[in-house]
A protein has these predicted regions:
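Short N-terminal targeting/anchoring amphipathic segment
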Residues: 69-72, 97-118, 131-136
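A conserved catalytic-core segment of Leloir-type glycosyltransferases
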Residues: 39-101
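Donor nucleotide-sugar binding/catalytic pocket of nucleotide-sugar-dependent glycosyltransferases
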Residues: 41, 132, 154-200
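Membrane-proximal helix-turn-helix segments that form the acceptor-binding/catalytic region
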Residues: 98-99, 105, 117-120, 124-128, ...
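N-terminal subdomain of nucleotide-sugar transferases
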Residues: 1-66, 196
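Histidine-centered beta-alpha loop that forms part of the nucleotide-sugar donor binding/catalytic region
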Residues: 10, 113-114, 137-140, 200
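Active-site proximal beta-strand in glycosyltransferases
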Residues: 5, 108, 126-145
Length: 200
């Protein structure tokens, strides 16, 4: 019987950034090995924040792309500028992907970050659907926000986001990171090293 994977990523081809390319490569590998994969993403718009020609920012659309069921959901699309606008983009995708994900059959859920709120959606889906979920960590968020001075580490918002992040790490059945440094950092934060896997 085929394993059914539900994958959440706000970047996916035809976008050509690193998250989209990495996600596509992983999914194609799984499909070739017999998995049935459904991706929930949004209308392609990176990096200009403008929907690509031939696509619309609709509430819901479903297509078959290279053997993968691709569901695109509505999100607040904006150029990659301004903290508040980006957060609106992230949160809107998290909400719509969660709602649509509730109606998708699966055996396992994978959610990739950045951005951080995709992982929130994946975790909540896992709780509601009683399925295991894997968190792929490509950036230590909200640490990355602090690194570019977009938010102070002693602010209430940062402390709250950091608490959510640690909660997500504990809830995930497995965590995939892209560097040895990321694994070391998570272990330092108290995450069980046995459930952290490095895939470069």
């Amino acid at each position: 019987m085929k394993i059914k994977i539900l994958f959440l990523s706000d970047n996916y081809p035809p976008e050509v950034n690193a998250p989209a390319s990495r996600t596509y490569e992983h999914i194609q590998h799984w499909v070739k090995n017999g998995a049935e994969v459904t991706v929930i993403t949004c209308a392609p718009n990176f990096p200009q924040g403008k929907v690509f020609e031939g696509y619309k920012n609709k509430l819901f659309s479903k297509t078959l792309q290279d053997g993968v069921t691709v569901i695109r959901v509505w999100s607040y699309i904006t150029a990659n500028e301004g903290f508040v606008k980006r957060i609106l983009d992230y949160v809107s995708y998290s909400l719509t992907s969660f709602f649509v994900g509730l109606f998708q059959g699966c055996d396992i859920i994978v959610a990739t970050s950045p951005q951080f709120f995709t992982a929130v959606s994946g975790c909540l889906l896992a709780i509601f659907k009683r399925k295991p979920w894997i968190m792929e960590v490509r950036d230590l968020w909200p640490e990355s926000i602090k690194a570019v001075s977009a938010m102070k580490s002693d602010s209430k918002v940062f402390v709250f986001l950091e608490w959510i992040e640690r909660w997500l790490y504990k809830r995930a059945a497995s965590i995939v990171v892209v560097t040895d440094t990321f694994k070391e950092k998570l272990v330092e934060w108290g995450v069980n090293a046995d459930k952290i896997h490095i895939v470069k």
